[in-house]
């Protein structure tokens, strides 16, 4: 924490914006459309509803593009792929970009497989507004897009499926570079990157925040990160990217802590998590620990 009054004032303003985002989602029930993986689609939709939003799930390019016209934001997750996705996802990303639509990307298992790599590489010039992933995915995406200077690239350990094998601290520089790249091409003139881990990180490329808290039980259910991406899109429908990424991450930290106390294992934890997403207050989210770092 900083003793600089200007820093404290800025953090206070940010907390107020986070509280407003949580309040607005529950008051406006914004639609966030998801093109997400088959394994976690149910949890993604239910989490968006529990957070206060509205969900729509689709895979056909013309359907996604049409729904994007009425959606507040969109979410693309590359966790499970079919052959036609190799052409469909780049087309969807290009149309979202051309139409000035905001969207969240979860680059699940970035660096594994030629098809996934080709899809993620195609997003470089028509990028999302927010990227949310684990440290290994963020480092891999930064490398794919060639954003680092040759002498400053932090090599990623080979991804272990959808699980991170890199620590969040190793992804700080990559996250900042990605966020600045997103901002340059964003329809709202800003972008953000959220890195999930033991202590989450969120950055817009200029300001960087660490978010202590959350529950290790999140790693014991499938779809925790995927559903967080969906809820991030829900918040992006009502807030600017940095606030949306922070609000969603903090909501999940608080909800997962509550769910862990109320559950006996992974099955009951998932149910308790949805209940907690519904019940956590805007004040609780905004009052969470937020540490601004360099």
From Swiss-Prot:
GO BP, sorted A to Z: thiamine biosynthetic process; thiamine diphosphate biosynthetic process
Function: Catalyzes the phosphorylation of the hydroxyl group of 4-methyl-5-beta-hydroxyethylthiazole (THZ).
Enzyme Commission identifier(s): 2.7.1.50
Major enzyme class: transferase
Entry binding sites for substrate: 57, 223
Catalysed reactions, as listed in the record: 5-(2-hydroxyethyl)-4-methylthiazole + ATP = 4-methyl-5-(2-phosphooxyethyl)-thiazole + ADP + H(+)
UniProt keyword terms in alphabetical order: ATP-binding, Kinase, Magnesium, Metal-binding, Nucleotide-binding, Thiamine biosynthesis, Transferase
Keyword Nucleotide-binding: yes
InterPro entries: Hyethyz_kinase (IPR000417), Ribokinase-like (IPR029056)
Signal peptide region: none
GO molecular function: ATP binding; hydroxyethylthiazole kinase activity; magnesium ion binding
Pathway: Cofactor biosynthesis; thiamine diphosphate biosynthesis; 4-methyl-5-(2-phosphoethyl)-thiazole from 5-(2-hydroxyethyl)-4-methylthiazole: step 1/1
Name the record gives this protein: Hydroxyethylthiazole kinase
Residues that bind ATP: 132, 196
Family the UniProt entry places it in: Belongs to the Thz kinase family.
Cofactor: Mg(2+)
CDD domains linked: THZ_kinase
Organism domain of life: Bacteria
Family matches, as Gene3D superfamilies: 3.40.1190.20
